[in-house]
């Protein structure tokens, strides 16, 4: 070590390593100190770069120099432990005094060669050829036999033995083999201790009470540990000193064919992972087996352990009670109650359902919406769902709950489409419209306002009651190739107004087929489970009016002949939803003055051609029929059917409601009043001009 650095450099290195200078030569301590101070001097960690560079230079020089010295000398201790008074004699490791002068003659001259080279030549000449040990060992152990007197020295070898020794000396490989063979014949190998059988798992009779999850982060408060009796006693005492706060602990002995073991049953105050409890046990069990699992049925397990073949050894409490194993169940929101509400209120919008149910969390006695009674879905259900809504307000899965409820509504609707006929579906829609009208359509002025919408439609179409009944018949029966309705006319002729009213009446959906062909499939997917659909403002390639812009709606429609016919099932798809094969619903289509190809026109059973009428537009401008969306409502269509058609024209299921509403209309609206409303519309006046004022006076 002294050859590696100078004295000043050694002191400087030890100061940089921040250890005492007396530790010079202790390589293990120096290496450990080097790792520690490297973190202090490293520039990336805010240290001194100059000190770090100097430390690396000195420490690297020490390591390189030591490697060179070891490679030259062959042994790091040969120089320091050489003694002039000993040499290797004729037999191996034999002590023999030696003439100092003879040895000194062999010592190298400082000016010639190196010490390491001379030492290797000296060792090879003096000892390597004589490195042979002939010995015999007794097969009996030294501990078993008493000490005997020292045997006499062996006699001098005979000439034959000397020749044999010389032969062995010349062939060291055979020497190694003979000595090895002698050791195996004289000293047999030690017998391995027979390992005790360790159980692979808990007793089979306890499987039903334990959790068999392999990788689980779930926390539990009941655990069962299976180990030896000694370790069970140790764990029973040391578990109190750990971070696991134990409320109840008991140990049970168990013996089977494989041996005897002990079961330690723990119930903790807090919840822990199985891995945490097992890690605590493994840290104290080096050789003993250990098994640890969570308990899913604590009370049943305790009762089973209290019976043979198990035996109670000790427990910190005299028995346990039922309530100690039961957790207080937190009251959670009732998902099914929300689903039932969505079905009864027929809500198929997730966000709408979410908003309605959040409003239910308000105290019913302080709710302004219940006092106004504007929406039936609110004031009829608020009180019954208030408690569940308070829990729903704290839930983190509000949207998931509402999505599940909406899915049930859509599933029930699809089931009705499969089980019910279209007439039965229409009857159900009639009853739904009647119930909704009961909520808002009451009072003479309100009824007169809605009857003004009925009168407007009678002026728009000649024999409108027959036309409406015909449309109703075509859409309901949905006969193949005789079920679609086309409403065509110039701008501002009332096409979309009439079509939108029928869409609300049938509870259908509007589709846009003027989109590019690659997006058309997803647009048509909106027709899944619909009673009918509206294709509004379809554009064509050839225009009959120079002010119209061409479009590709008619071209797309020409590629949907199977959809329009309704003869075979077509595949409809939505995003993130599998394709569904069904008959495409009947179509009500509106379009301006475009040329319609015969291949499309023949697939419409009814063609309505509307013409713009100035007095209809003037009448609407002077009334609130458009602002209140009366003309766009299906209630107006239903009121027109009630006003003009007899009771017998309706199905028996809805006749009771029809009679009730016909009586209501006759009570508030006379035939004379209705004629005056029609005349006001023809004159371009407010439909209720001179009627509502007289009634109010």
From Swiss-Prot:
ATP binds at residues 489-496. Its cofactor is Mg(2+). It is an enzyme of class 5 (isomerase). Pfam families: Polyoma_lg_T_C, T_Ag_DNA_bind. A zinc finger (T-ag D1-type) spans 330-422. InterPro entries: AAA+_ATPase (IPR003593), DnaJ_domain (IPR001623), Helicase_SF3_DNA-vir (IPR014015), J_dom_sf (IPR036869), Lg_T_Ag_polyomavir (IPR016392), Lg_T_Ag_Polyomavir_C (IPR010932), P-loop_NTPase (IPR027417), T_Ag_DNA-bd (IPR003133). GO terms for cellular component: host cell nucleus. Residues 148-158 have a biased composition (Pro residues). The modification Phosphoserine is found at residues 134, 140. It catalyses: Couples ATP hydrolysis with the unwinding of duplex DNA by translocating in the 3'-5' direction; ATP + H2O = ADP + phosphate + H(+). The keyword Chloroplast does not apply. Residues 131-135 are annotated as: Binding to host RB1 protein and transforming activity. Transmembrane segments: none annotated. GO terms for molecular function: ATP binding; ATP hydrolysis activity; DNA replication origin binding; helicase activity; zinc ion binding. Residues 136-198 are annotated as: Disordered. Phosphorylated on both serine and threonine residues. Small t antigen inhibits the dephosphorylation by the AC form of PP2A. O-Glycosylated near the C-terminal region. DNA helicase activity requires Mg(2+). GO terms for biological process: DNA replication; symbiont-mediated perturbation of host cell cycle G1/S transition checkpoint; symbiont-mediated suppression of host innate immune response; symbiont-mediated suppression of host JAK-STAT cascade via inhibition of JAK1 activity; symbiont-mediated suppression of host type I interferon-mediated signaling pathway. The J domain is essential for multiple viral activities, including virion assembly, viral DNA replication, transformation and transcriptional activation. This is Large T antigen. The lineage of its organism: Viruses, Monodnaviria, Shotokuvirae, Cossaviricota, Papovaviricetes.
């Amino acid at each position: 070590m002294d050859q590696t650095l100078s004295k000043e450099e050694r002191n400087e290195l030890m100061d940089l390593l921040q250890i005492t200078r007396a530790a010079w030569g202790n390589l293990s301590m120096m290496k450990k100190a080097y790792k520690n101070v490297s973190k202090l001097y490293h520039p990336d960690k805010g240290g001194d770069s100059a000190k770090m560079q100097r430390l690396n230079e000195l420490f690297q020089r020490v390591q390189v120099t030591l490697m060179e010295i070891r490679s030259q000398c062959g042994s790091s201790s040969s120089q320091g432990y050489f003694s002039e008074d000993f040499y290797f004699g004729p037999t191996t490791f034999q002590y023999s005094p030696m003439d100092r002068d003879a040895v000194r003659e062999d010592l190298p001259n400082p000016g010639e060669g190196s010490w390491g080279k001379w030492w290797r030549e000296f060792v090879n000449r003096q000892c390597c050829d004589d490195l042979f040990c002939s010995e015999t060992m007794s097969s009996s152990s030294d501990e078993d036999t008493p000490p005997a007197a020292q045997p006499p020295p062996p006699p001098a070898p005979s000439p034959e033995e000397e020749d044999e020794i010389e032969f062995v000396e010349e062939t060291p490989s055979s020497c190694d083999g003979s000595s090895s063979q002698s050791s195996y014949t004289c000293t047999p190998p030690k017998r391995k201790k027979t390992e005790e059988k360790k159980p692979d798992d808990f007793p089979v009779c306890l499987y039903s009470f334990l959790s068999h999850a392999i990788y689980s982060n779930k926390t539990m408060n009941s655990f069962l540990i299976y180990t030896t009796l000694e370790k069970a006693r140790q764990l029973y005492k040391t578990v109190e000193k750990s971070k696991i706060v134990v409320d109840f602990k008991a140990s049970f002995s168990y013996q089977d064919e494989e041996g005897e073991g002990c079961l330690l049953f723990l119930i903790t105050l807090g919840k822990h992972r199985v891995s945490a409890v097992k890690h605590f046990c493994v840290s104290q069990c080096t050789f003993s087996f250990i098994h640890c699992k969570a308990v899913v049925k604590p009370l049943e397990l305790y009762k089973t352990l209290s019976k043979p073949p198990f035996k109670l050894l000790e427990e910190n409490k005299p028995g346990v009670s039922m309530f100690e194993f039961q957790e207080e169940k937190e009251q959670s929101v009732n998902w099914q109650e929300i689903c039932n509400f969505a079905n009864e209120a027929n809500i198929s919008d997730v966000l709408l359902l979410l908003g309605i149910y959040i409003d239910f969390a308000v105290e019913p006695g302080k709710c302004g919406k219940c006092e106004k009674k504007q929406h039936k879905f609110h004031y009829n259900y608020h009180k019954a769902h208030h408690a569940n809504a308070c829990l729903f307000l704290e839930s983190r899965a509000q949207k998931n709950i509402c999505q599940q409820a909406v899915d049930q509504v859509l599933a029930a609707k699809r089931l009705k489409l499969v089980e019910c006929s279209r007439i039965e579906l229409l009857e159900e829609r009639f009853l739904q419209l009647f119930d909704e009208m009961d909520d808002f359509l009451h009072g003479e002025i309100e009824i007169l306002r809605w009857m003004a919408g009925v009168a407007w439609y009678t002026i728009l179409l000649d024999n409108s009651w027959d036309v409406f009944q015909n449309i109703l018949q075509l859409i309901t029966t949905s006969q193949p190739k005789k079920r679609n309705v086309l409403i065509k006319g110039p701008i501002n002729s009332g096409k979309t107004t009439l079509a939108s009213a029928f869409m609300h009446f049938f509870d259908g959906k509007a589709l846009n087929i003027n989109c590019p062909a690659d997006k058309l499939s997803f647009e048509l997917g909106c027709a899944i489970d619909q009673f009918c659909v509206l294709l509004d403002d379809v554009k064509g390639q050839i225009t009959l009016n120079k002010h119209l812009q061409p479009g590709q709606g008619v071209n797309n429609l020409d590629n949907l002949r199977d959809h329009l016919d309704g003869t075979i099932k077509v595949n409809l798809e939505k995003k993130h939803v599998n394709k569904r094969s069904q008959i495409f619903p009947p179509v009500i289509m509106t379009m301006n003055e475009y040329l319609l190809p015969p291949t499309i026109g023949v697939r419409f059973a009814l063609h309505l051609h509307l013409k713009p009428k100035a007095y209809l537009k003037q009448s609407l401008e002077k009334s609130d029929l458009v602002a209140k969306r009366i003309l766009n409502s299906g209630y107006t269509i239903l009121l027109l059917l009630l006003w003009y058609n007899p009771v017998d024209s309706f199905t028996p299921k809805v006749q009771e409601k029809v009679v009730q509403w016909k009586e209501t209309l006759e009570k508030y609206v006379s035939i004379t009043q209705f004629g005056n409303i029609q005349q006001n519309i023809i004159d371009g006046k407010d439909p209720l001009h001179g009627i509502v004022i007289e009634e109010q006076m």
